[in-house]
């Protein structure tokens, strides 16, 4: 195994994004490449000019909260009042639903970070003669909602170059298109702090586009004029922010609102106009996050006890496991067992589940093999939500295990080391070289080294 020097490390790391054609915001792909975006912007223009009611429907995770924040901030900065609804996980379920539509009487509805699976809700809106614009980034299923426009890079006939972008990025591009249509004077780079937060929280791969947005966004957060980020910076007390600060500290705080209570708490925090309201919201988020950790530990232990090491996947369930926690537990067990994990909470005979897997497994395709058993499902390649009758859980588990057995050779990631590292060269300059090419995430993984003849003095679990 080759020895790694400071010079060699810097050379390897910088080569990863040496020829990035999108290293500047001015050179990123145009919003015009999205299917339906011109139809959508003209409809929004019509609504603005006629004073028509506009309702934004978001989602309760960080990406959905940030997507909603961007839309509200964008319209508010123009002096245009819009309504918004962020579904409560426990009252409404996920995204645009019939329950949500029951609360909308007229106007134009715009979804952010959801909507691509909302077929029944779209029918209800059509019955009410309410136009629907869907902005989403989740996988497109067979049953496409009825909408005036669908802005989603994962549509087969969408020409946008990058398919793996988060919901907030789609919403941001939509706002940029509206700005262009209406000739508004708004600096779209002012949203990079929010975009950075959403991209990392939603575990998007560090493609050339995402890398540029997050890299610039991390700097933007550090110098942000938003009261929320100013307060978070004062708590973190760091000169340089890295992706782990977002992924393991900031994002979990914000996610705790939608997981444990109501996502509007996190939304209000991001939209805070003064230090006092930001402080008040953050105090609630800290309390919810602390409660989340307690519940998470209990469910993780119970799920661990139910798992079978011989199975190809972790598929476990129990009555009344907290719905807001099972996604984190699935992620934790997927990492520790190095296999896909499906965690279900059963209430009144219905099993609602969250699934997580590493980058080699396509969960959406995997779950599709058992689609005949499901009441509904949706998500990404590596994260998904699903529901089915409790009585169908054993058969679902059997199908999942059989399907994964066919793909056993790609079941888990292996660590690939860059080389052997002498402990003596791990000094501030060396660490600075690693930090200098932040952010790290999928498709731009953190460097792994082999270290010989060293003793572990201290370890710490984060997140």
Walk through the language-model features, giving the residues of each.
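Intrinsically disordered, low-complexity boundary segments flanking structured domains
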Residues: 135-140, 303-306, 403-408, 457-459
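Phosphate/diphosphate-binding loops
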Residues: 112-124, 382, 390-391, 395-400, ...
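A short, terminal or domain-edge coil/loop segment
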Residues: 137-146, 260, 367-372, 395-406, ...
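Hydrophobic helix-and-loop "lid/oligomerization" segment in the mid-to-C-terminal part
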Residues: 2-108, 128, 146, 179-398, ...
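Short, solvent-exposed secondary-structure boundary motifs
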Residues: 91, 112, 329-335, 449-453, ...
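Conserved phosphate-handling catalytic cores of large alpha/beta enzymes
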Residues: 101-102, 109-204
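A contiguous loop/helix-start segment that scaffolds small-molecule binding in enzyme catalytic cores
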Residues: 203, 223-227, 403-463
């Amino acid at each position: 195994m080759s020895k790694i020097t400071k010079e060699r490390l810097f050379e390897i790391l910088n080569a990863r994004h040496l020829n990035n054609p999108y290293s500047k915001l001015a050179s990123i792909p145009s919003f015009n490449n999205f299917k339906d975006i011109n139809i959508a912007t003209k409809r929004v223009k019509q609504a603005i000019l006629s004073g028509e009611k506009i309702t934004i429907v978001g989602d309760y995770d960080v990406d959905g909260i940030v997507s909603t924040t961007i839309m509200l901030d964008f319209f508010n900065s123009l002096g245009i009042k819009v309504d918004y609804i962020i579904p409560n996980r426990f009252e409404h379920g996920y995204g645009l639903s019939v329950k949500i539509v029951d609360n909308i009487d007229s106007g134009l509805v715009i979804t952010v970070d959801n909507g691509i699976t909302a077929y029944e809700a779209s029918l209800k809106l059509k019955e009410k003669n309410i136009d629907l614009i869907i902005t989403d980034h989740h996988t497109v299923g067979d049953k496409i909602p009825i909408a005036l426009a669908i802005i989603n890079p994962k549509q087969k006939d969408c020409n946008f170059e990058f398919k793996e972008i988060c919901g907030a990025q789609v919403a941001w591009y939509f706002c940029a298109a509206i700005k262009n249509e209406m000739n508004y004077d708004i600096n779209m780079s002012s949203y990079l702090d929010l975009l950075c937060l959403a991209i990392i929280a939603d575990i998007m791969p560090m493609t050339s586009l995402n890398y540029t947005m997050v890299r610039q966004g991390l700097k933007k957060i550090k110098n942000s004029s938003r009261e929320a980020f100013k307060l978070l910076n004062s708590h973190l007390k760091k000169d340089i922010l890295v992706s782990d600060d977002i992924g393991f500290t900031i994002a979990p705080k914000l996610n705790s609102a939608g997981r444990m209570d109501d996502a509007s708490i996190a939304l209000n925090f991001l939209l805070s106009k003064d230090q006092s309201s930001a402080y008040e919201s953050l105090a609630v988020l800290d309390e919810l996050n602390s409660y989340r950790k307690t519940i998470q530990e209990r469910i993780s232990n119970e799920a661990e006890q139910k798992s079978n090491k011989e199975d190809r996947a972790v598929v476990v369930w129990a009555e009344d496991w907290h719905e807001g926690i099972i996604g984190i537990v699935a992620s934790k067990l997927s990492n520790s067992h190095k296999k896909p994990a499906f965690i279900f909470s059963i209430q009144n005979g219905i099993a609602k589940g969250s699934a997580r897997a590493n980058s080699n497994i396509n969960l959406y395709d995997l779950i599709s093999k058992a689609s005949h058993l499901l009441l509904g499902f949706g998500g990404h390649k590596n994260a998904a939500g699903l529901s089915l009758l409790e009585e169908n859980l054993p058969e679902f588990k059997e199908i999942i295990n059989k399907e994964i057995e066919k793909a056993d050779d790609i079941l888990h990631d292996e660590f690939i080391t860059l080389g052997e590292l002498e402990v003596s060269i791990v000094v501030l300059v060396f660490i600075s070289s690693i930090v200098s090419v932040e952010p790290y995430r999928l498709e731009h993984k953190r460097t792994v080294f082999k270290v010989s003849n060293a003793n572990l003095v201290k370890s710490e679990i984060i997140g």
